[in-house]
Regions:
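Short alpha-helical segment of the dimerization/phosphotransfer core of two-component systems
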Residues: 157-162
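PAS-family sensory/regulatory modules and their coupling/dimerization elements
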Residues: 43-105
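Conserved glycine-rich
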Residues: 309-310
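Sensory modules in modular signal-transduction proteins
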Residues: 1-24
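Short acidic helix/loop segment immediately C-terminal to the autophosphorylated histidine
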Residues: 139-146
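Short conserved segment of the HATPase_c
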Residues: 270-282, 302
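Conserved micro-motifs of the catalytic ATP-binding
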Residues: 177-183, 215, 219-225
Length: 337
């Protein structure tokens, strides 16, 4: 009995044994935590003193009727899985064994997977529908010759959007897996920012946004392509969600905490209630999609920064612009290879 108690008390799962009359025979302390029981239950008391939810009761009743039962119990943001199995003795149901698991993280991952799948389906469908509709109009000869370049331009634009989306999904998948992203090297954040702003100059010109780079050399350890993704997506977002005659200021500097890059814009800003969600996949403050993009840029920043052990900070007010800062570990700090 002492060995049995020692084993069950060291389990993170809840373990509970009841008899045919639903009386508690034994349980470990994890049961109280996982079933949100306010006070311990004495042996011989009804198991329903631990939890009175309908799902829990159904599981107990099914097991005592001779049928194995699984049930999810949700409370606030927590999720528990109840697995109840009948116990037979001399051909009769003598009771049941219940195992309670904390599956909160598993269910959250599954929810995120479902949301991601639904979002991907929607985001892919939009440009594909546009491409198909335009192609059908061209195929049926419903376009004047002089209008063909315009319709062809629509197809080209939507195709580029589709390719961008697929590329961003691939990047996020690789970051999720965390391996095979490339060799770690010493990277100059200032040089990366300079190259990115040069690359984005045409986009900034189209949006009538001026860009400025200030600071100096700041060396970090990381995968060059992934560090570039961080800088590119920060600057691209700052330009895309800016206003005409707005500005983007990129500051690169060394601090006591480590190399830091800050991207500040004079754009539309982010409402306070949305600031906790802007790093989610496909989340957009601009629901009209008028600013373009895939809705994955800041999610890539978040995951790429985490891969490098970097911290991300956001400051914003609606209508007053946004400032995002990424602070990398010092190059001599212990990090990935």
């Amino acid at each position: 009995q002492e060995e049995f108690t020692a084993i069950t008390e060291n389990m993170s799962e809840g373990f509970l044994v009841i008899d045919q009359e639903t009386r508690v025979l034994t349980y470990n302390s994890a049961v109280l935590r996982l079933l949100y029981a306010q006070v311990p239950t004495e042996e011989g008391e009804s198991v329903y003193a631990l939890n009175r939810e309908a799902g829990f009761r159904r599981c107990v009743e099914e097991a005592l009727a001779g049928r194995r039962c699984e049930q999810l119990l949700e409370k606030d943001d927590d999720c528990r899985q109840i697995i109840a199995s009948p116990v037979e003795q001399d051909g009769q149901i003598a009771g049941a064994v219940l195992v309670i698991l904390d599956v909160t993280e598993k269910e959250q991952r599954e929810r995120l997977r479902r949301e991601f799948t639904a979002n991907v389906s929607h985001e892919l469908k939009t440009p594909l529908t546009s491409i198909l509709g335009t192609a059908e109009i061209l195929q049926n000869g419903l376009v004047k010759p002089e209008d063909v370049p315009h319709f062809a331009g629509n197809i080209h634009r939507e195709t580029e959007r589709l390719i961008g989306l697929v590329n961003d999904i691939i990047k996020l998948s690789r970051l999720d897996e965390g391996g095979g992203l490339g060799q770690w090297e010493t990277v100059d954040l200032y040089e990366e920012a300079r190259a990115v702003l040069e690359q984005l100059a045409p986009a900034a010109q189209r949006k009538q946004v001026t860009t400025r780079l200030q600071g100096g050399e700041a060396l970090v350890r990381g995968v060059p392509q992934i560090v570039e993704e961080i800088v590119y997506n920060l600057c691209d977002n700052a330009i895309a969600y800016n206003r005409a005659n707005g500005s983007v200021t990129v500051t690169v500097e060394n601090t006591a905490f480590g190399p830091r890059i800050t991207v500040a814009d004079t754009g539309i800003g982010i409402p306070r209630e949305a600031q906790g969600r802007v790093f989610e996949r496909f989340y957009r403050v601009d629901k009209s999609h008028s600013s373009g993009g895939t809705g994955l840029g800041l999610s890539i920043v978040k995951h790429a920064a985490a891969y490098h052990g970097a911290a991300v900070e956001l400051e914003s007010d609606e209508g007053a612009g946004t400032t995002i800062t990424v602070i990398f570990p010092k190059p001599d700090a212990k990090a990935r290879p």
